[in-house]
Amino acid sequence: MLSLVYHKSVPRYLLMRAGAKRIKNLETGRFSPLQLEDAPEPELPTPEWIRVKPLLSGICGSDLGTLSSDNSPYFSPITSPPFVMGHEVVGVVTDDNSGFRAGERVVLEPALGCAVRGIDPPCPYCASGRHALCLNVAKGDVSPGIQTGFCRDTGGGWTQRTLVAHPSQLHRVPEDLSDEATVALEPLACAVHAALKTNPGPDDTTLVIGAGNIGLFTVAALRRLTDAGRIICVAKHERQREEALRLGADEIVHPKRTYADLPEMLGTEAMRPELGKPVVTGGAEKVFECVGSAGTIEDALRLTKPGGKVSLVGMPGAKSSLDLTALWHKEVTLSGAYAYGVEEYKGERTSSFDLAMRIAPQVRLETMIGPRFRLEEYREAIAAARSAGREGHVKVVFDHRGIRH
């Protein structure tokens, strides 16, 4: 039984950094840190842990960044290679344990917080339900790892075998929610958290920069869970533009027209400095940056009105130069929106995952899944994920059910 295992080394890291974008298939070739191999089943760290057989596993932008070494070395002390990759997972429980029955379908909440690690009392963040912000991600019953799929002890979703999960990580899936819809719940939960954390009002103009799956899901969450008024989405490809409108955006702008069209749409103007990008005097009240590149982060700051808020939803890459003058001059508030947790929604405290499940039927997540690949086709799968926007895909997945489309 095969798994896709990430083996980190300094030479491989440097090779990927230098050549992954220039040399075709380097990140899945002979010298790649990702290798298809017969990895053993992970052991249960403690008796209450549960074994889960993945059905579908998504390919996330953070996975692609890991393979190409574009991710920041910030995460190096809080991950533990070699690890089986994959944190977007719908699967079935294999044995009766900890209140779960064999055959039950579950979606994984991959954060490895205090409860997962057997740490009691929990840190303040875990105690408040914000497990993704856990202070103890390098301590306890399992090796360092911010999430399943980045920890050597848990396994991950890119496997024909099983992964192991603490019962606190598992959410039962309603029967009427398909595997395809369920595998997208984890990124949708991230978008739910981002939308509610910034929570635009009806008088706000909200700008979403980026229309990959996290940008599209952010549009969906904003429209369904907040009172957001006008939503503008920056989307490059035809499928992305269509999906953004379907999910609730009012207007679409092509990235190449960012400074040509957006200032007028936002009721402001752009002025040309001697060097660099245009200076925008006004802007949107709330901006969600869903790409993670230095260029789009800078765009977000420049396109926010004075006193406005920018939510950094896309995972930033390795360090690069970034002009923060607009943040300083316009007194913009920049905050991160990482993963998920417990949300305050209409007077109730509930998890981001529960809210994601609540809106999933309206979003029609299953229509956004595909193509699907067997694990042995991982080279084609990674290539498809890399070109997803251009090829009209939203979420590329590994299908462990023996079905190929």
Task: List each language-model region with its residue ranges.
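Short N-terminal strand-loop motif that marks the start
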Residues: 1-85, 160-162, 401-405
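C-terminal hydrophobic helical "lid"/dimerization subdomain
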Residues: 17, 275, 298-301, 350-405
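Glycine-rich beta-strand-centered segment in the early N-terminal region that forms part
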Residues: 40-57, 72-127, 174-176
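NAD(P)H dinucleotide-binding glycine-rich loop of Rossmann-like/cofactor-binding domains
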Residues: 76, 87, 114-209
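Adenosine-nucleotide cofactor-binding segment
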Residues: 205-211, 223-295
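Glycine-rich Rossmann-fold phosphate-binding loop(s) that bind the pyrophosphate
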Residues: 210-214, 315
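C-terminal substrate-binding/catalytic core of Rossmann-like NAD(P)-dependent dehydrogenases/reductases
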Residues: 267-277, 281, 320-371, 379-380
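ADP-ribose/adenylate-binding Rossmann-like module
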Residues: 286, 302-320, 334
